[in-house]
Amino acid sequence: MPRRRRASRRVRRRRRPRVSRRRRRGGRRRR
């Protein structure tokens, strides 16, 4: 029987360092 995750109202927020939107991995955007 697969485990079910209980939906909790309280969501734990992960602290993440602020990253500027312009510079992401690699800096330049490729398409």
UniProtKB/Swiss-Prot annotation:
Its main location: nucleus. Testis. Keywords: Chromosome, Developmental protein, Differentiation, DNA condensation, DNA-binding, Nucleosome core, Nucleus, Spermatogenesis. The keyword DNA-binding applies. One of its GO terms (cellular component) is nucleus. It comes from the Eukaryota. GO terms for biological process: cell differentiation; chromosome condensation; spermatogenesis. It is found in: Nucleus; Chromosome. Residues 1-31 are annotated as: Disordered. The keyword Nucleus applies. GO terms for molecular function: DNA binding. Protamines substitute for histones in the chromatin of sperm during the haploid phase of spermatogenesis. They compact sperm DNA into a highly condensed, stable and inactive complex. This is Protamine-1A. It comes from Oncorhynchus mykiss.
